[in-house]
Amino acid sequence: MKIFNKDGNKNSKEDTKAGAENSEAQNSGSSAEEVNKARENPEEASASSEAEKSPEVKCQEEKQVLMEKYYRLAADFDNFKKRTARQMEENRKAVLEQVLLDFVEVTDNFDRALKSAKTAEDMSSIVSGIEQLSRQFFSILEKYGLEKIESEKASEFDPHRHEAVHHIETSEVPDNTIVDVYKTGYALNSKVIRPAMVSVARNPDEAEK
């Protein structure tokens, strides 16, 4: 009987040890299985992790993402403004350069005309040269959109394009028409930049009315 009890105790210890080993193996297998599942389905694992986060943590993370987007957009917009400003300045300089080059040609012709005028014996040739320079000069102005405002005598007075310097009583031209032009007016791309200075007719009969 003592021998039986001794063997029985021994068997009981072995059974306990075996049970513990089986339990540990099962836990280890379960952990390994979870790791494998996480590797095979990272999206599900991530979703599970997200679900475990508190609303406060989620809110902070979303705020951080939005702030990073804001800073990137602000930096991009700032760079865009700088590029646009540089491009506008380069365009302005290019246009100014072309305008000046056009007028340099007129300056060269003025210099030649002055040299010729000093030795010219015929005044008509000097006048002809000045007229040619005037045409060349204004052709450059027209190239950049400048035009003279129509201000012929007896043409109708337009308060949007003319400025009345004097009113003259006369019957030679219709009432409220231009009598004389004191200064030519100009428009740039159809916009009046300087109205023509003119005198305007007032017929005596109309004035009495």
Swiss-Prot record:
Residues covered by region (Disordered): 1-60
Annotated keywords: Chaperone, Cytoplasm, Stress response
Alphabetized NCBIfam families for the sequence: PRK14153.1 (NF010750)
InterPro entries, alphabetized: GrpE, GrpE_coiled_coil, GrpE_head
GO function term, MF aspect, one: adenyl-nucleotide exchange factor activity
A UniProt-annotated Pfam family: GrpE
Highest taxon in the source lineage: Archaea
Source species: Methanosarcina barkeri (strain Fusaro / DSM 804)
Keyword hit for Kinase: no
The UniProt record lists the keyword Zinc: no
Name recorded for this polypeptide: Protein GrpE
Similarity comment: Belongs to the GrpE family.
CDD domains from the UniProt entry: GrpE
Protein task: Participates actively in the response to hyperosmotic and heat shock by preventing the aggregation of stress-denatured proteins, in association with DnaK and GrpE. It is the nucleotide exchange factor for DnaK and may function as a thermosensor. Unfolded proteins bind initially to DnaJ; upon interaction with the DnaJ-bound protein, DnaK hydrolyzes its bound ATP, resulting in the formation of a stable complex. GrpE releases ADP from DnaK; ATP binding to DnaK triggers the release of the substrate protein, thus completing the reaction cycle.
HAMAP family: GrpE
Compositionally biased intervals (Basic and acidic residues): 1-18, 50-60
Subunit relationships: Homodimer.
An annotated GO cellular component: cytoplasm
Subcellular location: Cytoplasm
Example GO biological process: protein folding
